[in-house]
């Protein structure tokens, strides 16, 4: 395997055995590709904005004399970049401009004669843009649009499984779901009549819809039934015989022909009888006349001489009717063929209950059902029915819906019209009747072939279309009313409805969510999340167990492990690692093709529909070198079931062992040894890990860490290869390799790093360079680590030395005992950044003012504010400190004479304003790291705002100047090379000032041309610099666009450093979570024979019942990795020769059976080996991929190599007494995470505070500074103790006895410790409530 210079710094030893046939795909592609489809120009008009415009335009006026046509659209450039949008609190979006054409036709002239054409570009609102990382910045906050898993359009056949009717009879139904438009349901009732519902309204007999389509009763019967023909021959009756139709019936007479009795009366007709009849080619038999009674006519019979209707279609035959038919000359009589077995008379019965008789009455029935209370007219009824399913404006099955519809009805072609046809409706009814007759199966609605993904692009397109349709109505009216000669397209279009629809979707849709930004994994998982909730989806309350359950088709598409615990379980899922969506929006997963028993590297993506037809082997099937199956029988999946198949039957094979899990679950080592419930918790808790101060790569990983860190976008990744020319904390400059440069450019890439920025979850985002000056880098190398990444690998926690043993009850019930060393070394110290905002508004009484002159506040409280009343950067503040001084005007109040006197003496100011300053919340303390001031346009900026502005201008100029200097240096380097190669002496050239170089002329024409090109570039560079600087200056100095009524906003950023402490929640990656119970002195912790104390003591009882054995294996393997690291460290300390080091490290990499990873250290230089050794001395990182990890034998070998007992257990000594513990203890290294459930955020205490308005009881919760509820059960406890006075105090003065509270305060001040309880307010509330019900209750004194 070839490693780049950067990758050689630290190589993770991989225990994976299966070759990696397919690289991990880009993990955010589901978001980026979908949105790209939405905004890119699509000449076909199949999707995106183009499709939305084409579906609504052209808009014709009601008269048809004019129309507004769509020509094209373009998206402009966004005003602010992503960072500026986040700081200013605005949306990152681009203006949408649409070219429209207004065509006016001549009124009197023949159709299509154009009178006038006007074309104009119209502004149609702003479209939010996606950032490079798949998020949207809406009003300054990063949001993610979660993909939705919804029921695919098409036709579905289902049953109620016998739950609707008391008899337990199974009722079948069919539902046609369009992408847009009315739903059409067909359903059987318990009497086996077929009914139809439109949009889930009241049901009508299904034949109504057929009559509305223009079918008569006879035609309806002809569509759904086979016929039996009887011929009247004198007194005899003969029947055309189809032997197959007799199966299962009992003969009601002797069936004979040609004098031979085939079946005797009363006998059941079997397959043997049928074969006999077919063999003798019996096509006609004689039947008794009574046999025809009760049969149903299939068409109308008319007396030709009188024109009178004798027998109507669907009429039951009686012997009298038969005689009448015979007399009127009808000798051949057609009846419907029905039986109880597989040809039910359902449609015939339905026609009988149908109140309509012709097309008009059917249309009127449908109209009455859809628009109850409105008088129907023929036109209205026809228009309504036409618009329901046959109008392209109102109904659209979409390409997906048509494909699913045709597949379900077993048609050959999968394309067709978006609206329904007569045949479509009839075929659905026929299939439903077939299913009721026992032919065919109902669909499984939880099958992923019947559920599809709607991603950002598609949902945004739908919302945009909704906005356009609103505009369409207004345009139609304008075209009809206005004076068209003076109107322009601009006057027709109001962009508000479109902007509103788009804004509503991105801002407040259920699927537009505040991004989970705890760490890179939580970001990536949030973007790959798939929700069944949301508009057009399920609701939590209505979703049953089936929808939430894991389905066989989830394999390789949706993760069976990662889903939330609680009410959303199974409704919110995560995309599997390799899954992607196909053109129709169905999830597909890759497989390797198997040809003639050989597994090829040819990859096919199969959707759930296609997969069912194939036999697919698992990824861990044994193969020989040539890719042939070794075993005769192979475990495979087929039609959703797993079983053994012969190796010759296998058609596909899984791509990878981690194909079935999501990104989160694929990061859990030894996942295969964990119980699924705990794995679920482990996957979910990794997303809650807070980035620590110094990230520490996991010693035991799975090999997915690099992919997650790079794809999440938190690291800085090299766009092109080159050499590091400059590096500091905030910028990395790369001189690009010549072969990767574009013609005519400076060949310098500049990467500006993010420093100490606040994330959505208040954690800290900061990047640190991980390359040094002069290092070569290749495209895709990680240049700088972000939060929770270490040398380009995801690092959510810390490697801790753990021991599994009880310790004085401090690890009872999952508690965790932590050594003080962990706190001293800042292993789990995290930085949290809070944003506190102070808004100055224009009130009715006058503007609020931000000032340091605050009434009734002492000097000490103002010590950290500057003269503008805003806190200094760097100030250390604690709860209650003033950050921004603000005063609000007070209303005029009636003054007492004393107050008037005071006013007269001390001046006006102090009394007519009240203090409304921004203070630090209680319980928070930290350092101010940044202050931003936003001032409304037209409001004078205060001194602090001007200082900040000046500082920003200086910084911007400095950054741009440095950037220019770097680019200039690169450019002049190339100019120097051209001049020297053109014959100019280097010494003389170096003496000349650089600007003069461009004035030199060369004799070589090619070189001269090159020189001129470079000179042009230089001018362009300077021009570009001026332009950029001017744009920056304009952005910084201009006023801000603030909400109405807001004059000024001051944002203060407060950084809090939190060390780990008792009450914080920690967890491993295997669902093993707990709360810290005690931080123990280092000297009291258990230690080993070398005197090394352990960091964490865990309870061994947390393992067996939870069945997450993965944590034990991780501990052993971590110990082995650390042992090898220590051996390398010892060799480094003793300054061993590089050859010995190389040999030892090579042995470590080669350990294990047939590994896929081949590390050849002989290709590494001595310097590279030394650097690798330096990075390995704290432990050799190991990858054990999911379902393909290290075996027990390999772990033991590695332990042995690290000089650790193969049992993984060692003797420990008690730190307090020095005595040996009586048995050996499992000690090793486990990767522990600190979760975002910190005790500082939860700890809360209250003495007095705010009270509820109605009940006068203290409020609840930390946010309201509330009290602790003394509830019903607590009252019982005090009652049980007989503590009457304590109870009285709790229920009165400590709670809602208002007068008692005030008296109590007065008594305490007076030193009289008595209480006088009165009437609790909640009792008065109860009395009032009872009185409101009309029952008077009065309290009488005894």
From Swiss-Prot:
<comment type="similarity">
    <text>Belongs to the RNA polymerase beta chain family.</text>
</comment>
<dbReference type="GO" id="GO:0000428">
    <property type="term" value="C:DNA-directed RNA polymerase complex"/>
</dbReference>
<dbReference type="Pfam" id="PF04563">
    <property type="entry name" value="RNA_pol_Rpb2_1"/>
</dbReference>
<dbReference type="InterPro" id="IPR037033">
    <property type="entry name" value="DNA-dir_RNAP_su2_hyb_sf"/>
</dbReference>
<dbReference type="GO" id="GO:0032549">
    <property type="term" value="F:ribonucleoside binding"/>
</dbReference>
<dbReference type="GO" id="GO:0003677">
    <property type="term" value="F:DNA binding"/>
</dbReference>
<dbReference type="InterPro" id="IPR042107">
    <property type="entry name" value="DNA-dir_RNA_pol_bsu_ext_1_sf"/>
</dbReference>
<keyword id="KW-0804">Transcription</keyword>
<dbReference type="GO" id="GO:0006351">
    <property type="term" value="P:DNA-templated transcription"/>
</dbReference>
<dbReference type="InterPro" id="IPR007642">
    <property type="entry name" value="RNA_pol_Rpb2_2"/>
</dbReference>
<dbReference type="Pfam" id="PF00562">
    <property type="entry name" value="RNA_pol_Rpb2_6"/>
</dbReference>
<keyword id="KW-0548">Nucleotidyltransferase</keyword>
<dbReference type="InterPro" id="IPR010243">
    <property type="entry name" value="RNA_pol_bsu_bac"/>
</dbReference>
<comment type="subunit">
    <text>The RNAP catalytic core consists of 2 alpha, 1 beta, 1 beta' and 1 omega subunit. When a sigma factor is associated with the core the holoenzyme is formed, which can initiate transcription.</text>
</comment>
<dbReference type="InterPro" id="IPR007120">
    <property type="entry name" value="DNA-dir_RNAP_su2_dom"/>
</dbReference>
<dbReference type="InterPro" id="IPR015712">
    <property type="entry name" value="DNA-dir_RNA_pol_su2"/>
</dbReference>
<comment type="function">
    <text>DNA-dependent RNA polymerase catalyzes the transcription of DNA into RNA using the four ribonucleoside triphosphates as substrates.</text>
</comment>
<dbReference type="Pfam" id="PF10385">
    <property type="entry name" value="RNA_pol_Rpb2_45"/>
</dbReference>
<dbReference type="InterPro" id="IPR007645">
    <property type="entry name" value="RNA_pol_Rpb2_3"/>
</dbReference>
<dbReference type="InterPro" id="IPR007644">
    <property type="entry name" value="RNA_pol_bsu_protrusion"/>
</dbReference>
<dbReference type="InterPro" id="IPR037034">
    <property type="entry name" value="RNA_pol_Rpb2_2_sf"/>
</dbReference>
<dbReference type="InterPro" id="IPR019462">
    <property type="entry name" value="DNA-dir_RNA_pol_bsu_external_1"/>
</dbReference>
<dbReference type="Pfam" id="PF04560">
    <property type="entry name" value="RNA_pol_Rpb2_7"/>
</dbReference>
<keyword id="KW-0808">Transferase</keyword>
<dbReference type="InterPro" id="IPR007641">
    <property type="entry name" value="RNA_pol_Rpb2_7"/>
</dbReference>
<dbReference type="GO" id="GO:0003899">
    <property type="term" value="F:DNA-directed RNA polymerase activity"/>
</dbReference>
<dbReference type="InterPro" id="IPR014724">
    <property type="entry name" value="RNA_pol_RPB2_OB-fold"/>
</dbReference>
<dbReference type="Pfam" id="PF04561">
    <property type="entry name" value="RNA_pol_Rpb2_2"/>
</dbReference>
<dbReference type="InterPro" id="IPR007121">
    <property type="entry name" value="RNA_pol_bsu_CS"/>
</dbReference>
<dbReference type="Pfam" id="PF04565">
    <property type="entry name" value="RNA_pol_Rpb2_3"/>
</dbReference>
<protein>
    <recommendedName>
        <fullName>DNA-directed RNA polymerase subunit beta</fullName>
        <ecNumber>2.7.7.6</ecNumber>
    </recommendedName>
</protein>
<keyword id="KW-0240">DNA-directed RNA polymerase</keyword>
């Amino acid at each position: 395997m070839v490693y780049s210079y950067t990758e050689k710094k630290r190589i993770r030893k991989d225990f994976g055995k299966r070759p990696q046939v397919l690289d991990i795909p880009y993990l955010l592609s589901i978001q980026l590709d979908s949105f790209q489809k939405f905004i890119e120009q699509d000449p076909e008009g199949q999707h995106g904005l183009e499709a939305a415009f084409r579906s609504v335009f052209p808009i014709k006026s009601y008269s048809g004399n004019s129309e507004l046509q769509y020509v094209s659209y373009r998206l402009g450039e966004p005003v602010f970049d992503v960072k500026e949008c986040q700081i200013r609190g605005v949306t990152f979006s681009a203006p949408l401009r649409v070219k429209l054409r207004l065509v006016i036709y001549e009124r009197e002239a023949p159709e299509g004669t154009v009178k006038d054409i006007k074309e104009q570009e119209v502004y149609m609102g702003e479209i939010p843009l996606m950032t490079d990382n798949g998020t949207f910045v809406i009003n300054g906050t990063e949001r993610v649009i979660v993909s939705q898993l919804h029921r695919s359009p098409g036709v579905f056949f289902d049953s109620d499984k016998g739950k609707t009717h008391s008899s337990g009879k199974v009722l079948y139904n069919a539902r046609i779901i369009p992408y847009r438009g009315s739903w059409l349901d067909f359903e059987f009732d318990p009497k086996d009549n077929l009914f139809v519902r439109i949009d889930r309204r009241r049901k009508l007999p299904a034949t109504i819809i057929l009559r509305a389509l223009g079918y008569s009763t006879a035609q309806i019967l002809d569509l759904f039934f086979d016929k039996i023909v009887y011929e009247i021959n004198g007194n005899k009756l003969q029947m055309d015989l189809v032997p197959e139709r007799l199966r299962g019936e009992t003969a009601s007479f002797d069936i004979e022909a040609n004098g031979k009795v085939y079946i005797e009366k009363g006998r059941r007709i079997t397959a043997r009888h049928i074969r006999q009849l077919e063999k003798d080619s019996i096509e006609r038999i004689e039947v008794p006349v009574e046999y025809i009674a009760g049969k149903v006519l299939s068409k109308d019979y008319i007396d030709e001489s009188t024109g009178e209707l004798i027998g109507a279609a669907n009429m039951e035959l009686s012997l009298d009717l038969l005689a009448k038919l015979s007399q009127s000359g009808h000798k051949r009589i057609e009846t419907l063929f029905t039986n109880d077995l597989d040809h039910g008379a359902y449609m015939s019965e339905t026609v009988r209950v149908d109140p309509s008789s012709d097309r008009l009455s059917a249309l009127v029935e449908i109209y009455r059902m859809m628009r109850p209370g409105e008088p129907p007219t023929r036109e209205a009824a026809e228009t309504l029915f036409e618009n329901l399913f046959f109008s392209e404006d109102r109904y659209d099955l979409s390409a997906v819906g048509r494909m699913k519809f045709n597949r379900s009805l077993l048609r050959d072609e999968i394309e067709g019209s978006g609206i329904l046809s007569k045949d479509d409706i009839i075929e659905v009814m026929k299939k439903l009747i077939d299913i009721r007759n026992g032919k065919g199966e109902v669909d499984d609605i939880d099958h992923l072939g019947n559920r599809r993904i709607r991603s950002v692009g598609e949902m945004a397109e739908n919302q945009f279309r909704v906005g356009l349709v609103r505009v369409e109505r207004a345009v139609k009216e304008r075209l009809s009313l206005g004076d068209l000669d003076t109107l322009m397209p601009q006057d027709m279009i109001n962009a508000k409805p479109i902007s509103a629809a788009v804004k509503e979707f991105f801002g407040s849709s259920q699927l537009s969510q505040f991004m989970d930004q705890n760490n890179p994994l939580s970001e990536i998982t949030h973007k790959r999340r798939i929700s069944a909730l949301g508009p057009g989806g399920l609701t939590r309350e209505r979703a049953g167990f089936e929808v939430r359950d894991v389905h066989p088709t989830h394999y390789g598409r949706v993760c069976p492990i990662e889903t939330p615990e609680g009410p959303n379980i199974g409704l919110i899922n995560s995309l599997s690692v390799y899954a992607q969506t196909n053109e129709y929006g169905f999830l597909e997963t890759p497989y390797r093709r198997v040809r003639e028993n050989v597994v090829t590297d040819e990859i096919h993506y199969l959707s759930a529909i296609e997969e069912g037809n194939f036999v697919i082997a698992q990824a861990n099937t044994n193969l020989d070198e040539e890719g042939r199956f070794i075993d005769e029988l192979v475990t495979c999946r087929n039609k959703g079931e797993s079983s053994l198949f012969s190796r010759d039957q296998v058609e596909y094979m899984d791509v990878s062992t981690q194909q079935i899990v999501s990104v989160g679950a694929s990061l859990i080592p030894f996942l295969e040894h964990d119980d699924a419930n705990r794995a679920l918790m482990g996957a979910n808790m990794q997303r809650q890990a807070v980035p620590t101060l110094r990230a520490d790569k996991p010693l035991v990983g799975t090999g997915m860490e690099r992919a997650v860190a790079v794809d999440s976008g938190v690291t800085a990744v090299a766009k092109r290869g080159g050499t590091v020319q400059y590096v500091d904390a905030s910028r990395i400059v790369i001189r690009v390799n010549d072969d990767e440069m574009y013609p005519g450019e400076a060949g310098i890439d500049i990467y500006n790093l993010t420093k100490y920025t606040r994330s959505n979850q208040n954690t800290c985002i900061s990047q640190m360079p991980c390359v040094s000056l002069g290092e070569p880098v290749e495209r895709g190398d990680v240049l700088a680590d972000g939060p929770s990444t270490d040398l380009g690998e995801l690092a959510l926690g810390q490697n801790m030395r753990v021991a599994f043993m009880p310790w004085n009850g401090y690890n009872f019930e999952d508690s965790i005992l932590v050594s003080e060393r962990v706190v001293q070394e800042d292993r789990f110290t995290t930085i949290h950044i809070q944003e506190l905002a102070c808004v100055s508004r224009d009130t009715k009484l006058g503007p609020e003012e931000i000032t340091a002159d605050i009434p009734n506040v002492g000097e000490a409280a103002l010590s950290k504010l500057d003269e503008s009343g805003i806190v200094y950067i760097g100030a250390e503040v604690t709860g209650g400190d003033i950050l921004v001084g603000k005063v609000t005007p007070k209303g005029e109040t009636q003054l007492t004479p004393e107050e008037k006197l005071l006013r007269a003496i001390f001046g006006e100011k102090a009394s007519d304003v009240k203090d409304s300053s921004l203070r630090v919340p209680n319980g928070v303390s930290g350092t101010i790291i940044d202050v931003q001031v936003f001032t409304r346009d037209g409001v004078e900026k205060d001194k602090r705002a001007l200082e900040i502005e000046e500082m920003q201008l200086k910084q911007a100029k400095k950054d741009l100047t440095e950037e220019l200097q770097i680019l200039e240096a690169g450019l002049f380097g190339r100019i120097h090379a051209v001049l020297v190669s053109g014959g100019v002496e280097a010494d003389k050239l170096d003496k000349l000032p650089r600007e003069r170089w461009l004035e030199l002329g060369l004799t070589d024409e090619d070189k001269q041309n090159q020189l001129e090109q470079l000179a042009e570039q230089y001018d362009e560079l300077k021009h570009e610099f001026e332009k950029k600087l001017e744009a920056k200056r304009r952005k910084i100095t201009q006023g801000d666009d603030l909400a109405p009524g807001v004059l000024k906003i001051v944002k203060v950023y407060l950084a809090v450093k939190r060390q780990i402490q008792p009450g914080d929640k920690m967890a491993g990656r295997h669902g093993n979570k707990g709360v810290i119970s005690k931080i123990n002195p280092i000297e009291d912790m258990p230690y080993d024979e070398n005197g090394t104390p352990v960091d964490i003591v865990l309870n061994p009882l947390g393992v067996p019942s939870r069945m997450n054995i993965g944590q034990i294996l991780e501990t052993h393997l971590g110990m082995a990795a650390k042992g090898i690291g220590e051996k390398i460290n010892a060799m480094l300390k003793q300054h061993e020769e590089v050859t010995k080091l190389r040999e030892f490290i090579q042995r470590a990499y080669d350990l294990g059976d047939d590994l896929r990873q081949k590390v050849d250290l002989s290709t590494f230089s001595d310097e590279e080996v030394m650097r690798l050794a330096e990075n390995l001395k704290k432990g050799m990182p190991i990858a054990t991929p999911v379902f393909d990890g290290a075996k027990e034998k390999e772990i033991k070998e590695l332990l042995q190599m690290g000089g650790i007992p193969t049992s993984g257990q060692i003797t420990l000594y008690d730190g307090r007494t020095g005595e040996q513990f009586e048995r050996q203890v499992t000690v090793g290294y486990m990767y522990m995470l600190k979760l975002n459930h910190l005790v500082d955020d939860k700890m809360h205490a209250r003495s007095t505070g705010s009270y509820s308005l109605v009940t006068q009881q203290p409020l609840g919760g930390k946010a309201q500074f509330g009290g602790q509820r003394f509830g019903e059960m607590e009252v019982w406890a005090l009652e049980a103790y007989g503590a009457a006075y304590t109870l009285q105090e709790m229920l009165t003065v400590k709670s809602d006895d208002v007068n008692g509270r005030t008296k109590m305060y007065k008594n305490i001040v007076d030193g009289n410790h008595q209480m006088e309880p009165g009437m609790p307010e909640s009792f008065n509330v109860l009395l009032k409530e009872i009185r409101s019900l009309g029952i008077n209750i009065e309290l009488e004194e005894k």
